Each structure stands twice: as C-alpha cells, then as structure tokens.
Amino acid sequence: MSEETVPEAASPPPPQGQPYFDRFSEDDPEYMRLRNRAADLRQDFNLMEQKKRVTMILQSPSFREELEGLIQEQMKKGNNSSNIWALRQIADFMASTSHAVFPTSSMNVSMMTPINDLHTADSLNLAKGERLMRCKISSVYRLLDLYGWAQLSDTYVTLRVSKEQDHFLISPKGVSCSEVTASSLIKVNILGEVVEKGSSCFPVDTTGFCLHSAIYAARPDVRCIIHLHTPATAAVSAMKWGLLPVSHNALLVGDMAYYDFNGEMEQEADRINLQKCLGPTCKILVLRNHGVVALGDTVEEAFYKIFHLQAACEIQVSALSSAGGVENLILLEQEKHRPHDVGSVQWAGSTFGPMQKSRLGEHEFEALMRMLDNLGYRTGYTYRHPFVQEKTKHKSEVEIPATVTAFVFEEDGAPVPALRQHAQKQQKEKTRWLNTPNTYLRVNVADEVQRSMGSPRPKTTWMKADEVEKSSSGMPIRIENPNQFVPLYTDPQEVLEMRNKIREQNRQDVKSAGPQSQLLASVIAEKSRSPSTESQLMSKGDEDTKDDSEETVPNPFSQLTDQELEEYKKEVERKKLELDGEKETAPEEPGSPAKSAPASPVQSPAKEAETKSPLVSPSKSLEEGTKKTETSKAATTEPETTQPEGVVVNGREEEQTAEEILSKGLSQMTTSADTDVDTSKDKTESVTSGPMSPEGSPSKSPSKKKKKFRTPSFLKKSKKKEKVES
C-alpha cells in the first residue's frame, strides 16, 4: 500500500490551464458532499465563518487595548472628530456586552451604561412625550449616584406621565441608581399595579410607592417627587427646630411642612393627615426622623429644590457642630434677605438681550445634562437653550450677494430636480427680498440709446427710495384717522351705506370713478415736466393730425356685393359700346341738339371743370340734385331762362366716384361715357342746339318737360334678367 501511495504524494501540481473541477477526482467523498450541498446552506456557512472571525477579533484583549490606546492618544492631542466618537462608541459596546471577559480598565467613564437605550421600535408604544420623561428620570438617578446621595433602599424618583390615566414611572426594586436606564423604568398606576413592565425582570416596591401615591392623590398639581434620606437630611429632620435659615440655600428652598412619618401609608387616616399637613402650595415635606421629599411641577424644579435642600442641611449640620448650639447662630430674616421670588416661572435673559420664559431650575438642569453627555452617558435630553450661540445673519445684501445662495458643493448628495430647485431658489429670493432693510421703488426711466434712435419708450428699473428723484414738490397727506376724508357733520349711517354700496359694486365688478374727496376738490394737479412725457404727448399729437388728414370720403358702394358690382361694370361697358355706335351715326344727323352740344366751342369753362372735377362727397351731390330740381321747375315756368352752370343730372358724380374707387383704368372711360348716358336713354332731357343764350350756353326748349329724379341705372334690373325670371 505504501508503494501505491508514494507516487500520489509525489505527483506534481496540476497545470494552471487545467479547469478547476478537473483537479478533484469524482470519487472523493468530500467533493461529493460539497457538490450535493444546497447553495443557501453553502452561503450561510460562509457568513458564519466570517462572523466567527469578527467575533474573535472583538473578543481579543490585544485589540481592545490597542483601541483604548488610540482613543487616549487622540484625546490628548485634542482631536474631537467624528472618528474618535465612533471609536468610543465601539469601546462602549464592547464594555457593556462583555463585563466578565475583560478586566476593569482605567477608562471607567466609557464603561457606563447609556441612559437613553430606547430604540425606534420601543418608542412606538410610548405615550406622547414619554421618551423624554424616561430620559429625565434616569438622568436624575445618575446624578444622585454621582453626588453620593443614593441609598440602597427607598431612594425613589417618580414622575406622573398622564393626569387623565394617573400613570407613573418608577425604578424597579433592587436596581441601583447607576444601573437605571430609560427602558428599565416601570409604568404603574395610582395603586402601584404594573401597567407596562420595563426591560428588567425586577418587581415594583409597592411599600416605597405608597408615600408617593398618597402625595400624588393629595396634590394633583405635582408631577415629580424626589425622596432622599441622606445623613444630612436625616439629621435635620431629627432636630426639633427643623431647617434654620442660616444660609442662602435655606432661603431658596421656600416654605416647608413637617410630618410624623411611621414608614407606612396604608391607613386612610394617615393619608388625611398627610394632606392636611402638606397644604396646597408647599413644595418641601420633612419626614420626622426619616428624610425629606421634594415636590415639583417639573423634573427640573424638583431637582432644583432637592439640590438646595441638601446643601442647606449640610451647612446647618456643620454650623451647629462648630457653633455648639442654636443660640450661637445668626438667623436670616426671610423678608429682608429673600434673594429671589421663588415661583414656577422665572425670566431668563440679560438686560439688553431677548427675554424668554424658562422654568425654575431649567438652566441648572441643562448644565448637568451637558456634563453627563460630555462624560458619555448619552442622556437623550432635548435642550431648549443651545450652548453655542448661532452667528448673527448679515442684514446687508451687499455683503452676501445673491450668487452665494445658489452655490452647491460637488460632494453634496444627488442632484435636486430642476423644477424643485427652481421653486426653492424662488422661495429663497423672495425671503431675501422681503427681509432686506432697503426700500425699493419701481421707476420708469427713458433709455438714452432708445432716445437717440427716436423711440421715447421708457425702461423700467428698481431704485432705492432715497435715490429716486421726486417729480413733484407737493406735500403728501398723512392719514391719521380712517375717517379723515369723510366730510364733517355727516350721518354715520350714510357713510356705512356708501361703504356697503362700494363693496357691492366691487363684488359685481362695476367700474366707476368712486367717491370724490371734498378736501382734494380744489387741488390742481401740476403738469409733469419730464422730457419723456412731453415727447409722448408730442408724438400723440402728430398721430392725431395724421389721422384727421387721412380721413376718406365714405364709399357709397360699400353696401353692394361683389356680384352687383360686376353687373354694374358690364352695364357700363355695354353703354359705352352703344355710345360709340351713336357717335359714328352722328355726322348723318347734323340737326341733333344732343350731338352738337359736346362739340360746341363756346361751352362754358365751368361745365368742363365740372366734368373733370375730383371726387365729390355724397352730401354735395344730394344738394346739387335738389338745386337741379328747383332749376328744372323754373325752366318750365320761364322758357327764356337758361340752365344754371354746374348742374349734375341723375347723380352723375356718384357714378364717377364709384368708378374711380373701383379701378383707375376704368375711370377715364366712364367719365367720357357718363356725359352722354342721359342723352341716349332720354332724348327729351337733351339741350336743343337752336338759339344760344348771350352767355354762350344753349337754351332749353319749352316744349320738352324735365322728368323727375329717377333711380340710378345700376339699381335697376336689366332686361335680360327680367326675361330670364319671366
């Protein structure tokens, strides 16, 4: 067998190019077991191996010593960065989880159990504000332990959680003050029955809670009770004269009550006697030959009372032991030497600083909480007064330009969406604009470049109120009375009715000039002398003159349709063709007065000017038509009178005006045709070529009568249309 195994042991390693699975033989049992194992189990085994290594490193004494040495070295250098705090938390975790494994270290502060050990899941079941209450009570227990006031039994601090349900917080029996945490407190009712058990497995001391429950029942205003029986307080409680006003701390304590305490409060008579002895306002209760109890509306006030009471008892015991008797002590009068008015609310702040309300003993309690936090107790206390004052923000927008607010560092988180970023920037700009100490006015200033180009359009800019030049020298009216502009000796009811009427108009969107002020009725508004307004007025005047000059005569054919205008054009062309045919036959009829009239050389120049005159308004043509009818009547009565010059027959100038508006090319043809339109249609209206008047105008025949004014030809229906319709 040895000969068979030797070649296998001395076999060379597999080449690098060989696949991984080919390196193992398929008959190997270890390979078969690994291959048949599930993937989830394989991953779990790997994680367990990694955790085992981490646990071994954390449990090694060498690693802990190295970590503590690193923290001490960095603390000596004055480095208080976040990395040191993280290392300190790791050391606290190692110290709190493995007390028996490691020896006691010189860094005993870091080995303290944190006060605030409530996690997010634990806080969900708590009442409103209960988390902070638990942290405060646990912090008071730690302070009692640090000051050396804690005793092995009956040293309890209780707190009322809610007045409606009468639930209270108390530490479990058998837990020392240095071990109390926020989660280990037990919630009980007024009878001492457990409502909510803490993280510890210890019970509640119902005998010790009887005194607290009796005080809570007698005084509903009390929320916190601290019970002490230190040597100093027990000695003062055994003296016949009680606490003497021999020190400043004794005056700060306030009124005190004394009660003969037998150790139990089970009987109803004991509770009644305690209630009579305590009274409605007393905050200190001295239990004869036992100790003291401090009451408070808050935890801060109760600790403030017990702190000064303990100091006053220590001073009194020391003074009596050194003086030899009460007759050798100087007692202070409370009326003369009262330093402060002891109350539930005090004012905190300097003479020139902002004044704000603070509870009694709140500043002192916050200082002690900062001390515990610096020692690593992690109190979880919420500070109302920050220790480091924030820097005052600059009010001048010149020192901090607007571009600084929009600056973003590269190491910031993911980029904000553009719409949200724009909204945030708008809000910041609005806030900065509203908080600015400067006052701006919107001013219209004429731009120099635009003024040189001839455009008087102003440019809108924002200027400071001090830099704006006042356009008028008038004095502004200061409104001192809301009814300043109401006339004197008026009925208030009328004023109210007018106000309601104006409001009703505003609701209905009725625009009006509004009420006029009688005080300002005689004030004459001065005309603005600014160059921009003058230029605007001049330009407006020029535009008005241009508009007046460009006014045209109203078109008499504006109401006609395109089809009617086309028919009118065709009719004019047809008449022109008929006139051309008549002109060709004119030499054969020399006696025709209608054809000899246009060729007469003695024609009046007024008539030629009338035929070649420009556009005439319809009103003028109507006036001429009336004159024409009058002259025609006169001609019938007086046959020897001549026809007046410039008479227009059958509205010829209206047709001439329409032709010039329609087309310039047709205007010349229509003017020549219009002179003979009436002669072709009505031969009786033509002027005879017989005897001439002395002025050179042809006289009218008395036998032929003038017809009345008939409708224009374009308004009549043509014969062709009549035939088609028939």
From Swiss-Prot:
The modification Phosphothreonine is found at T55, T533, T611, T675. Residues 588-606, 632-645, 689-701 have a biased composition (Low complexity). InterPro entries: Aldolase-II_Adducin_sf, Aldolase_II/adducin_N, Aldolase_II/adducin_N_sf. Signal peptide: none annotated. One of its GO terms (biological process) is protein-containing complex assembly. Belongs to the aldolase class II family. Adducin subfamily. It is found in: Cytoplasm, Cytoskeleton; Cell membrane. Residues 425-444, 704-721 are annotated as: Interaction with calmodulin. Residues 702-726 have a biased composition (Basic residues). One of its GO terms (cellular component) is plasma membrane raft. SMART domains: Aldolase_II. It comes from Pongo abelii. This is Beta-adducin. Each subunit is comprised of three regions: a NH2-terminal protease-resistant globular head region, a short connecting subdomain, and a protease-sensitive tail region. The modification Phosphoserine is found at residues 11, 25, 60, 344, 530, 532, 535, 592, 596, 600, 604, 613, 617, 619, 621, 686, 689, 693, 697, 699, 701, 703, 713. Its main location: cytoplasm. Keywords: Actin-binding, Calmodulin-binding, Cell membrane, Cytoplasm, Cytoskeleton, Membrane, Phosphoprotein. Residues 1-25, 467-486, 525-726 are annotated as: Disordered. Membrane-cytoskeleton-associated protein that promotes the assembly of the spectrin-actin network. Binds to the erythrocyte membrane receptor SLC2A1/GLUT1 and may therefore provide a link between the spectrin cytoskeleton to the plasma membrane. Binds to calmodulin. Calmodulin binds preferentially to the beta subunit. Residues 566-586, 621-631 have a biased composition (Basic and acidic residues). One of its GO terms (molecular function) is structural constituent of cytoskeleton. The keyword Ligase does not apply. Heterodimer of an alpha and a beta subunit. Found in a complex with ADD2, DMTN and SLC2A1. Interacts with SLC2A1. It is a peripheral membrane protein. The keyword Glycosyltransferase does not apply. Residues 665-674 have a biased composition (Polar residues).
